[in-house]
Regions:
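Active-site recognition of the HExxH zinc-binding catalytic motif
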Residues: 1-15, 19-22, 26
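Post-HEXXH active-site segment of zinc metalloproteases
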Residues: 17-44
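Acidic/histidine-rich catalytic neighborhood
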Residues: 42-67
């Protein structure tokens, strides 16, 4: 929830693109003195990065997944259960509306733009010399 709050606050500050809002949220959490806020940002980054990895290389995703600590696995499972509730016809319609809304507002990737924050994460860590 903390990373979502930071994401929405970044929109209020004028960053309308979803990938930018996610990345700003990650940075805000990453730079926080609050352990829970840092964890929330790390989880958001992990979810987006591993979702993208799964699309491109399910075997690499599985390798990484087996290395995650039990507490992280529990939190990921809870996150999946939460979002599973919205996999309904109404939820799918809302996703289509959100996709159309984003595209109408010059975010040509629509809902796919949320995950593009992974590109920004990679650039950030490259600039830091960490990858």
């Amino acid at each position: 929830i903390s990373s979502t709050m930071c994401h929405e606050l970044s929109h209020i500050c004028g960053f309308m693109r979803e990938d930018e809002a996610n990345f700003i949220s990650y940075l805000a959490c990453y730079n926080s003195d609050n352990t829970e806020l840092r964890y929330s940002g790390a989880m958001m980054g992990l979810i987006h990065a591993t979702n993208r990895l799964y699309r491109y290389d399910p075997n690499a995703w599985q390798e990484i997944y087996t290395l995650l600590p039990e507490g992280v696995l529990r939190d990921l499972a809870a996150n999946s259960r939460y979002w599973k509730k919205y996999e309904t016809p109404v939820g799918e319609t809302a996703d289509r509306w959100n996709d159309a809304y984003l595209k109408a507002n010059d975010q040509t990737d629509g809902v796919q733009s949320y995950g593009r924050m992974v590109d920004l994460l990679i650039a950030f860590y490259r600039a830091q010399g960490l990858i």
